[in-house]
A protein has these predicted regions:
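Short, charged interaction patches at domain edges and termini
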Residues: 99-166
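An exposed acidic His-Trp-rich patch
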Residues: 74-114
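Short, solvent-exposed beta-alpha or beta-beta edge segments that form flexible loop/patches at the rim
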Residues: 18-53, 57
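"Short basic amphipathic alpha-helical interaction patches in structured regions
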Residues: 66-76, 127-131
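A generic structural motif
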Residues: 57-65, 119
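Polar/acidic, low-complexity leader/linker segments enriched in S/T/G and N/D
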Residues: 1-13
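Short acidic, glycine/proline-enriched loop segments that cap or flank alpha-helices
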Residues: 40-46, 62-67, 85-89, 101
Length: 166
């Protein structure tokens, strides 16, 4: 299963210049399990939401060669495009990042980013699954969400009104 931290880590690794990314590391610091059970469709069931603080660090970041604002911009872009909607759904509002920068010498610094992230803990029936639940075997899965692109809404008569793409 790919986590939000996995996604953010891969994004930074793909977009930060190689020299600046040599001392890069990412890990989870602290985790809270939020009860948020519900049927999410397609035979899937969400047990809970895992909220944690992601720590990403760059040792010996060459701030004179690579503008440190690149890291901030990349985080903002990733948050806008990839951050889990489960944060809003479960009422998690404080998603502000904390940046800690320590100068090492005239050309490098250690940069540490801490940011709250969340992942859904979703299971699906699977005869070979490792999780016994409600008389069945289940496996952990990445949530699969289907989005309707069009529909027809019926009111009081048989003439429907199309919605979305046709």
């Amino acid at each position: 299963m790919k986590t939000q931290l996995d996604s953010l880590t891969a994004f930074f690794m793909q977009n930060v210049p190689e020299r600046a990314g040599r001392g890069f590391d990412s890990q989870i610091d602290g985790m809270k399990v939020i009860s948020a059970a519900r049927d999410v469709g397609n035979g899937q069931y969400r047990l809970s939401v895992l909220r944690y603080t992601a720590l990403l660090s760059w040792e010996r970041f060459p701030f004179r060669l690579v503008d440190p604002q690149l890291l901030v911009a990349l985080l903002e872009v990733w948050m806008d495009e990839h951050a889990a909607p489960v944060l809003e759904e479960t009422g998690i509002e404080n998603t502000e990042a904390d940046w800690d920068v320590t100068l090492e010498d005239e050309e490098t610094a250690t940069v540490v980013l801490s940011i709250p992230l969340a992942d859904e803990l979703v299971i699906r029936p699977d005869a070979k699954g490792l999780i016994p639940y409600r008389g069945e075997r289940w496996s952990l899965v990445e949530p699969e969400i289907w989005t309707a692109l069009s529909a027809t809404v019926y009111g009081v008569d048989e003439s429907g009104a199309p919605v979305g793409e046709s």
